[in-house]
A protein has these predicted regions:
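Class I S-adenosyl-L-methionine-dependent methyltransferase catalytic core
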Residues: 1-263
Length: 263
């Protein structure tokens, strides 16, 4: 897929108007948006950025500035505010409509109009999972930034296991805050779109003396999957949730989630 160049927007400017606790407000840098979204075919899609103030959101600006190159059909954006507006861009004209509420939970009718929700919701498990759940209810896809701990929640894990939710292609852990500071956070891209990642290889051969067995499951413990996962082992392996970032569904199956015990 074509790699889209940065627009003239400063990558250090804030990228989304989120709501929730002020400590949850981490704004996405444009370079991270470009890096991840270049992996998806968005041609003919209507995008909804539902936690994004159009005047400052790097998500909205990226889609608006690359509307024709991406082949988009439409672009919506809404945000939390006492007097919110819904922005719509069709490639040539931008219009605004007053909303009764900026909370994405109250704007299901707008979500029904889109194909994919792409945003950075407030950094809390409940917000991210609620957004995924809502999009699933309306039959819409998501590409969002969310906490790594999403994978530990039963409902979300079941979606991961059934290939209904995947970790994205690129890493993302540096953000800007309302005060202008740069912060790091344990986050990932999450999407309900099926990913197509290359087979994962470390070049490591299995040696039983190098791996401990779990006491509570018939699996070997993989401490650092990027360095220790053996290419020639075909039994069960216990890996951290971060392994989802390199998961190829044709290479590995997700079986279950456990809290490993090794005595």
């Amino acid at each position: 897929m074509k790699k889209y160049p940065y627009t003239t927007i400063d990558e250090d400017k804030i990228g989304g108007f989120n709501y929730g606790n002020r400590g949850d407000q981490f704004y996405t840098q444009e370079k991270n948006i470009v890096s991840e979204l270049s992996n998806y075919d968005l041609k003919g899609k209507i995008i909804y950025c539902n936690c994004d103030r159009p005047t400052v959101s790097n998500f909205y600006k990226f889609f608006k500035n690359n509307f024709n190159d991406l082949g988009l059909k439409g672009l919506y954006a809404s945000y939390y505010d006492d007097n919110p507006l819904l922005a719509y861009f069709n490639g040539s004209q931008e219009t605004y409509k007053r909303l009764s509420s900026g909370r994405f939970q109250d704007n299901g009718e707008v979500m029904k109009l889109c194909d994919i929700v792409i945003t950075n919701p407030p950094f809390s498990d409940s917000m991210a999972t609620e957004l995924i759940r809502m999009a699933k209810k309306y039959g819409k896809h998501v590409i969002i930034v969310g906490p790594n701990t999403i994978a530990s929640q039963k409902e979300m894990f079941d979606m991961i296991k059934n290939n209904q939710l995947n970790m994205g292609y690129t890493t993302i852990n540096r953000f800007n805050t309302p005060s202008g500071e740069k912060k790091t956070a344990p986050t990932s891209w999450w999407t309900t779109i099926e990913t197509n990642k290359p087979f994962f290889k470390t070049g490591v051969k299995y040696n039983p003396s190098n791996y401990q067995k779990l006491d509570n499951f018939d699996a070997i413990d993989i401490v650092r999957f990027d360095k220790d996962l053996p290419d020639d082992y075909y039994g069960y392996m216990a890996v951290s949730p971060r392994f989802l970032r390199v998961l190829n569904r044709n290479q590995f199956d997700i079986i279950t989630k456990i809290r490993p015990v090794i005595n």
